[in-house]
């Protein structure tokens, strides 16, 4: 068994390769939900959906969000009616949000709702929300404290971040299913997702760090050189007091990681780390990196 910690970008590219080189029933993915949001009365879980759509074979891999060849008739009509839907939601994608929202309103746990949706999509992997507790990442800006989606989508990441804040009514806890997946795994891989808004929220959930203590943990940096492959990781890391580099990423995961992987293009050597080509520009590159990570995990286990 192998468990990944994942956001919605970076790690799914690695998962694209991993599903080709290992038994898909042996893969568990614990997914960030701190970017979840209710829009137009429906529940969007963007990172969970990206992972689910990837495994279902319907992900739009041009954008790494949404469903391939989706239409946007409803979104366009909502805008025509003067409503402020600032996230462009496809029609099939919206159907998933409607279904999830209905299940949550009926009292279903997010974990169970996700399992139901994955079954409908024929997903064989074990896709797990990080928690059934509602958690939200907000960023402090000149506009005040705003939801991460408002910062990244509505404001296009163009406003200065002063701080990153996690908000929840009660302290978030890892679900029993998450703990079981980690405990059953031979290795845990912290994927190359945003350390601040994708991975840290998972690690902040009660129980998961303790479950990972006795596991072999591999972390993959999201930086190519000193630049993140995608998204606002650099600005978010600086606002959180970390250097926006692979070294800064390693500092985020201090005392948790057994092996840190950074890119061959990284200008700085790191102690107790190895270099691999982590720029996954296509499926073959994703497969190559996945095979190398599996080999490292097997070597450590031997």
UniProtKB/Swiss-Prot annotation:
List this protein's GO terms for biological process. Answer: F420-0 metabolic process
> Is Magnesium included in the keywords of this UniProt record?
yes
Instruction: Establish whether keyword Magnesium is in the entry.
Output: yes
Task: State the species of origin.
Answer: Methanoregula boonei (strain DSM 21154 / JCM 14090 / 6A8)
Q: What is the protein name given in its UniProt record?
A: 2-phospho-L-lactate transferase
Task: Note the subunit structure.
Answer: Homodimer.
Annotated binding of 7,8-didemethyl-8-hydroxy-5-deazariboflavin, by residue: 49
The family classification in the record reads: Belongs to the CofD family.
Q: Which HAMAP family match?
A: CofD
Cite the EC number: 2.7.8.28
**What role does this protein play?**
Catalyzes the transfer of the 2-phospholactate moiety from (2S)-lactyl-2-diphospho-5'-guanosine to 7,8-didemethyl-8-hydroxy-5-deazariboflavin (FO) with the formation of oxidized coenzyme F420-0 and GMP.
Q: Which Gene Ontology terms cover its molecular function?
A: LPPG:FO 2-phospho-L-lactate transferase activity; magnesium ion binding
Q: Which UniProt keywords apply?
A: Magnesium, Transferase
**What CDD domains does the record point to?**
CofD_like
């Amino acid at each position: 068994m192998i468990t990944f910690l994942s956001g919605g970008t970076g790690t799914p590219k690695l998962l694209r390769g991993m599903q080709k080189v290992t038994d898909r029933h042996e893969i568990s993915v614990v997914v960030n939900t701190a970017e979840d949001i209710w829009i137009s009365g429906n529940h969007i879980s963007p990172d969970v959906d990206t992972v689910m759509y990837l495994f279902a074979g319907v992900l739009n891999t041009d954008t790494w969000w949404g469903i391939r060849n989706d239409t946007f008739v409803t979104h366009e009509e909502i805008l025509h009616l003067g409503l402020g839907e600032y996230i462009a939601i496809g029609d099939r994608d919206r159907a998933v949000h409607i279904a999830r929202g209905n299940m949550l309103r009926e009292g279903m746990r997010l974990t169970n709702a996700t399992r139901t949706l994955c079954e409908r999509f024929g997903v064989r992997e074990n896709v797990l929300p990080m928690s059934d507790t509602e958690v939200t990442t907000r960023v402090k800006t000149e506009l005040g404290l705003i939801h991460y989606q408002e910062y990244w989508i509505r404001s296009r990441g163009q406003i200065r971040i002063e701080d990153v804040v996690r908000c929840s009514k009660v302290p978030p806890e890892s679900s029993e299913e998450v703990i079981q997946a980690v405990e059953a795994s031979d290795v845990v891989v912290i994927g190359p997702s945003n350390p601040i808004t994708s991975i840290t929220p998972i690690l902040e959930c009660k129980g998961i760090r303790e479950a990972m203590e006795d596991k072999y943990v591999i972390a993959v940096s999201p930086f190519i050189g000193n630049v993140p492959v995608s998204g606002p990781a650099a600005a978010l890391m600086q606002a959180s007091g970390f250097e926006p580099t692979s070294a800064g990423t390693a500092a985020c995961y201090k005392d948790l990681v057994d092996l840190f992987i950074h890119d061959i293009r990284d200008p700085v050597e790191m102690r107790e780390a190895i270099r691999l080509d982590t720029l996954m520009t296509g499926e073959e590159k994703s497969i190559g990196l996945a095979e190398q990570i599996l080999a490292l995990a097997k070597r450590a286990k031997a």
